[in-house]
Structures are given as C-alpha cells and as structure tokens.
C-alpha cells in the first residue's frame, strides 16, 4: 500500500477527516437536546435510553472490525463505506414513525459511525510524521471539544425552527462533502490480492462484545435472568471467538498483535483512563449541583475545563516530543492525570467550583498526553498492514472503559447511599435524583445533602484509584518499541520513537 497524497492535498484530506469526525462527535449531543420533542411526537418513552445506547453499542462493536477491514482493503474505501452507511441510517432516522423504528435506524447509524474514529486516526498516522502528528490530532480533538458545545445549541435551534428530522439529515451534506474530499485528495495504491474476510470472527466478536455492553448498560435495570443470559452469551461467544481467531487465515482480531507488550499495556492504560474519565464526567456535575448547590451552567463549566484541557495538551504534544522526547511526554500525562483526580478528594459542601474545574482541567491535559502518545507509539510500532487494527484496538479500549466506568460509578453511588443513608433518607435521596429538578431541592435539604456528599466520595475515591492505576499502567508501556517486521516496499516506514 502506498499513500500518494501531495503536500498541497493534505490540508484537504485533514479537512475531510475533521468533517467526518464532526458527524460522529456531534451525534450524542445534538440528539439529546431534541429527544423531548421526538418522544412527544413519536411516543414510546420506554425506548428513550436505547436511542443513545443503540448508536453507541453498534459504534463500539464495529470499531475493531473496521480497523481490520481498512488494513485489508485500504483506508479510503472502508471509511467511505462506513460514511455511506451512516448517511443511510441518518436519512431513515428522519423518517422514523415510532421510537422502536428510530432505535433500529440509530443502530444502522452506529454501524456506519464505527468506521470514522479508528480510520481517521489511522489516516493521520499514515500521512504525518511523528513530530507533525500531534498538531493534526489536536485539530481532531478540537472538533470533539467544539461538538460538545455546539451540539446542544444546534439541536435546540433545529427543533425550534425546523423539523426534528433535520438533526439527523444535517449529516447528509456533511457526509457528501467528506466523501468528495476523500475521493479527490486521498489516493491509495492497494496491493491486488484476494483478501479473506473473517465473517465468523466478526460475527462472534459482535455478539460477545454486544452482549457485554448491553449487560453493563442495563446492569441496574434488567431482570436478573436476562443479565445471566447475557453473561452466558458473552462468555460462550467470547471463548469460541478466541479459539476461532487462533486458526483463522485473516483473523478479524490478531491475537498476536493484541498480546504484544506495547499494544497490551497501551490498551490497558487507555481502558483504565477511559473508565476514570467517564467517572469524572458522570459524578462531577451532579456533585456541583447537588452538594455545592450551583446551577447546571456552573456544573457544565467544570466539565468544560476538561474539554479545553484535552485538545490543548494534544495540540502541544508535537512540541513536547521534540523538546523532551515521547517517553517524558507520556510520563507527564501519567502524572497530571492522578493529580487532577486527587482534587476531587478535597471537595466539600463549601468548596468553590473552581477547585473542581482545576482538577477537571488537569485530568483533561493528562488524558490528552496519554492518548496521543499511546496512539503514535502504537502506530509507529507496526507496519501499514496492521496499523488500522492497532489503532482500532486503542479506540475500542477507551470505548469499553467508558462503558465500564458509567456502570461502576453508578454502582459505587448506590452503595454509598445505602451505606450512609438510613432507610428514609436513602429513599428520599433516590426520589429526588429521579426528579427533573431534584438536584435543586436536594442541595437545600442539609441532611440529604450530607448523605449525598458522603455517597459521592465513594465514586471520587474510585476515580482516584483508577487514575493511579492508569499511572502505573503507562509506566509499563515500553516506549521506544520498534516495528517487529519491516514494512513492505513503498509503504511509510515507522518512525523511530525517541526516549
């Protein structure tokens, strides 16, 4: 495989990648604002959460599969195929006649969106040298930050002035622009050979991971028998998958790749960091509102510090590589991450939200450095034909960590409420948390607020422990690991990673 993008064409390729990323990044935030209107017109409130879960489950499950397909058939055709599938799902979502049909069409959207994040990151790894990659990835991280702010505003404007269908149809022009940009400016010369797609492996992987993600998502709501069945499906299909992959000619997941020390430790560190980070975003806003008694706007500002810190640190990572080396850059991120988490332990009912914002910002900076250094290190350790799979493994680990973190933090909060609250107080607290304006009333009730404060500390301790484990895992990453085998002639050789 040879990428023949000219220097003049690279800005157009990165612009196309940014538009593609925007489609994936804005999905959750733009839909959330419009959901009350959609439910009001379509009915079926019981499907509310599945409008989000279906998209995320499909996206997470297909990430690894798309990474492998991009190694077999090239980045451009695989990414375009994913975008087309996303656009088909978006078009159908606008014509949904019920919440059940909307969930199905969101599933189709997610199946397409699974291609965007791993393949765009892989294209950056293909086109940019090590010292340039941080700036390019910083631009992509900036798209995520902007999407977090603009998504809710765009959703509100569309619902107020147009049909809610346009929150999905807005993807159509964006997708067309992206496809045109990729067709015109991203050129690949694919080696002509008949690739054997591991259909059974892809099916088993999808069933196993899908069962795990549904199990984690519905752990506190589904009947015990269903959870047990999901657990059996996860274990059985997962075991079959592992046995099958060891003998498949072109395994959808290369066990050899995933068990390399560099890939394995990077994925573990990313999974732990993703778990800790979703823990922060889950519990910090409700603490600021329910315990500190601040407005949703203030609570959102504390998380905005995280959204600023992440892309900011990614943008400066290239300069840090050149000045201090990639190993020290990774170590700096691993130190900032638990320091930021430790700020949570000093929060109390009389604390300033600034304290929470500083901790959030430091965790964002740490996560940015950890994610970008792990990404470039993995990408530079493998040849072109494995780079898509390696990149996808890292993104999948972060996605799985996010799902684990949401479940873990909910469990810790419930344990804390049960431990610190008497029967009446615990019941009252649960009732308030289930009300739209419950956090406002909660902060005014001193006894309930005290229980909530203590209960949330269990979650804070969990975030700190995960951040410390992330620190340990990053120090186990063998930075400087070189490619095991030389790339084929005509491919971009891995760049050496400085110590």
Say what each PLM segment does.
Residues 2-8, 177-206, 222, 246-264, ...:
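Flexible interhelical linker loops that connect adjacent transmembrane helices
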Residues 2-13, 17-19, 437-499:
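Transmembrane-helix exit segments and adjacent C-terminal regions of multi-pass membrane proteins
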Residues 10-33, 46-54, 76, 142, ...:
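12-transmembrane solute porter fold
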Residues 38-39, 69-70, 154-162, 216, ...:
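Interfacial helix-cap and linker-helix signal at transmembrane-aqueous boundaries
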Residues 40-41, 71-72, 95-97, 126, ...:
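Membrane-helix boundary and inter-helical linker elements of multi-pass secondary transporters
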Residues 60-61, 91, 149, 206, ...:
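Hydrophobic/small/kink-forming positions within alpha-helical transmembrane segments
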Residues 63-200, 218:
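Helix-loop-helix hairpins in multi-pass membrane proteins, especially solute transporters
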Residues 173-190, 206-218, 233-247, 470-478:
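C-terminal membrane-cytosol helix-exit motif in multi-pass small-molecule transporters
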């Amino acid at each position: 495989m040879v990428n023949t993008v000219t220097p003049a064409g690279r800005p157009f390729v990165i612009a196309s990648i940014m538009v593609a990323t925007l489609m994936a990044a804005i999905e959750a935030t733009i839909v959330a604002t419009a959901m009350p209107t959609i439910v009001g017109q379509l009915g079926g409130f019981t499907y509310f959460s599945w409008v989000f879960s279906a998209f995320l489950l499909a996206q997470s499950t297909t990430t690894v599969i798309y990474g492998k397909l991009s190694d077999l058939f090239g980045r451009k055709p695989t990414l375009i195929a994913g975008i087309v599938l996303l656009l088909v799902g978006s078009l159908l979502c606008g014509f949904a006649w019920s919440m059940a049909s909307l969930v199905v069409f969101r599933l189709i959207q997610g199946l397409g969106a699974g291609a965007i994040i791993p393949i765009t990151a892989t294209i950056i790894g293909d086109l940019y040298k090590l010292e340039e990659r941080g700036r390019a990835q910083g631009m992509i991280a900036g798209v995520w930050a902007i999407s977090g702010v603009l998504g809710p505003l765009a959703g509100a404007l569309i619902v107020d002035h147009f049909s809610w269908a346009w929150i999905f149809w807005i993807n159509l022009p964006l997708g067309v622009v992206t496809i045109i940009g990729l067709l015109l400016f991203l050129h690949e010369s694919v080696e002509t050979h008949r690739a054997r797609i591991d259909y059974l492996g892809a099916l088993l992987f999808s069933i196993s991971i899908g069962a795990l993600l549904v199990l984690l998502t519905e752990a506190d709501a589904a009947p015990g028998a269903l959870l047990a069945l999901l657990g059996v499906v996860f274990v059985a299909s997962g075991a079959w998958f592992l046995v099958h992959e060891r003998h498949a000619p072109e395994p959808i997941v290369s066990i050899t790749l995933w068990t390399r020390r560099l890939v394995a430790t990077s994925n573990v560190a990313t999974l732990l960091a993703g778990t800790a980070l979703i823990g922060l975003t889950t519990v910090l806003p409700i603490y600021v509102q329910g315990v500190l008694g601040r407005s949703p706007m203030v609570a959102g500002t504390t998380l905005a510090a995280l959204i600023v810190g992440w892309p900011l640190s990614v943008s400066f990572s290239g300069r840090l590589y050149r000045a201090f080396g990639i190993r020290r850059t990774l170590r700096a991120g691993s130190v900032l991450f638990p320091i930021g988490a430790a700020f949570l332990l000093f929060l109390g009912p009389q604390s300033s939200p600034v304290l929470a914002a500083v901790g959030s910002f430091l965790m964002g900076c740490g996560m940015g450095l950890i994610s970008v250094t792990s990404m470039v290190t993995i990408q530079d350790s493998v040849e072109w034909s494995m780079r898509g799979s390696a990149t996808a493994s890292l993104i999948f680990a972060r996605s799985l960590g996010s799902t684990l973190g949401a479940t873990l933090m909910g469990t810790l909060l419930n344990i804390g409420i049960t431990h610190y609250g008497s029967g009446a107080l615990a019941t009252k607290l649960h009732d308030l948390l289930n009300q739209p304006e419950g956090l406002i009333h909660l902060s005014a009730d001193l006894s309930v607020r005290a229980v909530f404060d203590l209960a949330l500390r269990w979650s804070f301790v969990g975030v700190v422990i995960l951040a410390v484990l992330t620190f340990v895992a990053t120090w186990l990453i063998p930075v400087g690991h070189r490619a095991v085998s030389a790339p084929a002639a005509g491919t971009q050789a891995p760049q050496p990673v400085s110590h």
